[in-house]
């Protein structure tokens, strides 16, 4: 019975012993995954931890994470954590001692001492910390519980400091001082401010601060002490270690094969060094590098590093094979099979690369070939062969009529960039370009092509290219390799006459002398086209938007989109009506027969514009006199020409010249073409007017009443035509005239 009773009493004891053993074994396991390892932006590695007791080694390593602002604190010493290093270092925030900074008194405000003492405390103050003082006329003192440890004095007297160069390097006493803390200091530290007798008056010496910190300061980056007072704290470095006297602390860590008799212990992954501090032993553990990295305080926390993936393995092995080993790597000669695979890989890669380049090259060749075929097709369709034949017959004029390649014009206009557009009209878009020789040109890209008129177009290009007159925009050549022909003209930079004459926002006022000079130049150009050229050429669209001005206000007639050449024995052209409202010859509109006198009528409207400064058509005028020509004829009939002369030139003009030009304009606007002067007569008469050898007699001859009634096409008339026509070719803005265009022939 006694034996049975004894056995029953031993069972609970055995269970207790087994429980202790199991607990001891379980303590060697990793902390559970539920343990939080981050607080804010600060990592909390084991042996530190947040949460339950199994998340950290012992209470000295417990970290409390403030749920409001995610700020970590070391629980036992109640200090905010800055960072944790597994190399045995933590940084905490320690308060700043201050005097005379904000309280109105010079009495120091000393914070509670830094206390890291206690049974089993692993923390101590390292010798990386400095005692720093910033301010004037005081001493900063660091003390333990019973005695002063170190101190330094800060003064604003430059005689008490070293040279300027020395002051710039360290805080050596001028406005700031610092001193290193000796090793082996107690675990309770305070920082005080001592003010000499006579300097403790309120406000005397200003703000003074003193603090411990592991940060480095010099007189260059130390500003006013108020900055440190406002900051409120400084970073202090604490060392930490394991107390080997308690097996409960040493048992859970990975590097646990240690004994008190050996100064150094290591296994294949991690090592621990032993030492003594304040009468007790400690050890510091770390992963053996460079072969391992990780956390040595966790079972299996040090993991192997694959050096073959790093520069150290690649650089050392070079042409050999890098083989990763536990804790290191080895360079071994490449095996034949392995070398064979490498060669095969290089060959396959090279073949694929060559294949890709071949496919790309073939694609570019096909694209280039297609483009070349398309360009040749367009060249033939647009009359390129005929133009070549024409140029071959006129060897002396080859340069004047050049055939440009599409590549040249694409380069000149930056691939017809929309930012290069000078203007747009019914016949096409005009771009500003620069040729390889530096010449600035206007490149007109047509919108439509009439394949039935190819031969006529080529003949006219050749004729127009031979025109060489200083008051006519020069056709430099064309490109026929595009879907629609592209014409290249000389560039005229100063815009069109319409804009300069009618734009009220323009500060420039065109004087009468300039207007008369422009009229003479236009007349001379038209006279040249009608009589002096190889074949008479009728412009068919004379208007102020087609008169361009260069930098010297020299007129240049442009836009030959609707012009036609005739043989010498021809007196007129029978065509579909083309032109612009306000400028179209009424006789031409009724008969569809365009003569040289039709250009004279349009020029007469331009003369009236120069005289009056008004636009060729306006809805402001009365219904019957909406057109400028009719309005002018009505003024002539009522003998009030002077009333409609432009106010901007009345005060400075020669009135005899004005009346003479008005008389000439009236004759140009005669309804019957036979009664109008020709352009040569107009040009000579204008020259005579300018030389003041012409007497107008002030009186302007008037035609009969029948002429007056049928002088101009009214807007009330019903025409079976559309309302779209070419705009100005080279000016930088859209046409500003109120003239409404008719539909032109489909031209180039």
UniProtKB/Swiss-Prot annotation:
Keyword list, A-Z: ATP-binding, Disulfide bond, Glycoprotein, Kinase, Membrane, Nucleotide-binding, Phosphoprotein, Serine/threonine-protein kinase, Signal, Transferase, Transmembrane, Transmembrane helix
Top enzyme class: transferase
Function noted in UniProt: Serine/threonine-protein kinase that may function as a signaling receptor of extracellular matrix component.
Lineage: Eukaryota, Viridiplantae, Streptophyta, Embryophyta, Tracheophyta
Protein name: Wall-associated receptor kinase-like 2
Region described as Disordered: 727-748
Positions of glycan attachment: 66, 83, 160, 199-200, 221, 257
Signal peptide residue numbers: 1-27
Organism field: Arabidopsis thaliana (Mouse-ear cress)
């Amino acid at each position: 019975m006694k034996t049975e009773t004894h056995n029953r009493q031993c069972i609970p004891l055995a269970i207790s012993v087994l429980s202790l053993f199991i607990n001891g074994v379980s303590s060697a396991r990793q902390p559970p995954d539920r343990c939080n390892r981050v607080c804010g932006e600060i990592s909390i590695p084991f042996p530190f931890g947040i949460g339950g007791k199994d998340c950290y080694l012992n209470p000295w390593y417990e970290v409390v994470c403030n749920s409001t602002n995610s700020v970590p604190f070391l629980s036992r010493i109640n200090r905010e954590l800055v960072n944790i290093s597994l190399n045995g270092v933590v940084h905490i925030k320690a308060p700043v001692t201050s005097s005379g900074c904000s309280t109105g008194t010079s009495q120091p405000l000393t914070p509670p001492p830094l206390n890291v003492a206690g049974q089993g405390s692993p923390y101590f103050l390292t010798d990386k910390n400095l005692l720093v003082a910033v301010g004037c006329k005081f001493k900063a003192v660091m003390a333990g519980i019973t005695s002063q440890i170190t101190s330094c004095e800060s003064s604003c007297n430059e005689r008490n400091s070293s040279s300027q160069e020395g002051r710039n390097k360290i805080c050596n006493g001028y406005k700031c001082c610092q001193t290193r803390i000796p090793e082996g200091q107690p675990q309770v530290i305070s920082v005080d401010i001592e003010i000499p007798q006579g300097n403790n008056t309120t406000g005397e010496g200003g703000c003074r601060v003193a603090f411990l910190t592991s940060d480095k300061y010099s007189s260059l980056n130390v500003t006013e002490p108020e900055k440190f007072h406002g900051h409120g704290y400084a970073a202090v470095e604490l060392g930490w270690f394991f107390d080997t006297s308690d097996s409960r602390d040493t048992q859970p860590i990975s590097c646990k094969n240690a004994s008190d008799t050996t100064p150094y212990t290591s296994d294949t992954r991690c090592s621990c060094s032993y030492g003594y501090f304040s009468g007790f032993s400690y050890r510091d553990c770390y992963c053996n590098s460079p072969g391992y990295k990780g956390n040595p305080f966790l079972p299996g926390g040090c993991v192997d590093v694959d050096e073959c993936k790093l520069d150290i393995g690649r650089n050392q092995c070079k042409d050999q094979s890098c083989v990763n080993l536990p804790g290191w790597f080895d360079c071994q000669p490449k095996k034949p099979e392995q070398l064979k695979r490498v060669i095969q890989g290089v060959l396959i890669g090279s073949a694929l690369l060559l294949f890709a380049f071949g496919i790309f090259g073939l694609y570019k060749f096909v694209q280039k070939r297609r483009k070349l075929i398309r360009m040749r097709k367009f060249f033939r369709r647009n009359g390129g062969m005929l133009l070549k034949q024409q140029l071959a017959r006129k060897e002396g004029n080859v340069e004047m009529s050049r055939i440009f390649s599409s590549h040249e014009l694409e380069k000149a206009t930056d691939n017809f960039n929309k930012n290069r557009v000078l203007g747009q009209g019914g016949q096409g878009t005009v771009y500003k370009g620069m040729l390889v020789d530096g010449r600035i040109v206007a490149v007109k890209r047509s919108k439509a092509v009439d394949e039935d008129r190819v031969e006529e177009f080529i003949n006219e290009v050749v004729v127009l290219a031979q025109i060489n007159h200083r008051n006519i925009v020069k056709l430099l050549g064309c490109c026929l390799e595009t879907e629609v022909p592209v014409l290249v003209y000389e560039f005229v930079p100063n815009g069109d006459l319409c804009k300069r004459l009618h734009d009220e926002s323009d500060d420039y006022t065109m004087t009468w002398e300039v207007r008369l000079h422009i009229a003479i130049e236009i007349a001379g150009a038209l006279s040249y086209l009608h009589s002096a050229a190889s074949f008479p050429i009728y412009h068919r669209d004379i208007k102020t938007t087609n008169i361009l001005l260069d930098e010297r206000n020299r007129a240049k007639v442009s836009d030959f989109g609707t012009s036609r050449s005739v043989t010498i024995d021809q007196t007129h052209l029978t065509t579909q009506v083309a032109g612009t409202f306000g400028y179209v010859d009424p006789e031409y509109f009724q008969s569809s027969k365009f003569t040289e006198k039709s250009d004279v009528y349009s020029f007469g409207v331009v003369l009236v514009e120069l005289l009056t400064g008004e636009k060729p058509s306006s809805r402001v005028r009365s219904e019957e006199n909406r057109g400028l020509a009719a309005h002018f004829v009505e003024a002539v009939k009522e003998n009030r020409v002077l009333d409609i002369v432009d106010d901007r030139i009345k005060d400075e003009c020669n009135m005899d010249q004005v009346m003479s030009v008005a008389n000439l304009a009236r004759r140009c606007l005669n309804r019957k073409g036979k009664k109008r002067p020709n352009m040569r007569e107009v040009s000579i008469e204008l020259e005579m007017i300018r030389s003041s050898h012409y007497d107008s007699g002030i009186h302007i001859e008037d035609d009969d009443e029948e002429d007056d009634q049928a002088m101009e096409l009214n807007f009330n008339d019903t025409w079976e035509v559309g309302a779209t026509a070419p705009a100005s070719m080279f000016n930088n803005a859209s046409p500003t005239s109120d003239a409404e265009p008719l539909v032109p022939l489909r031209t180039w």
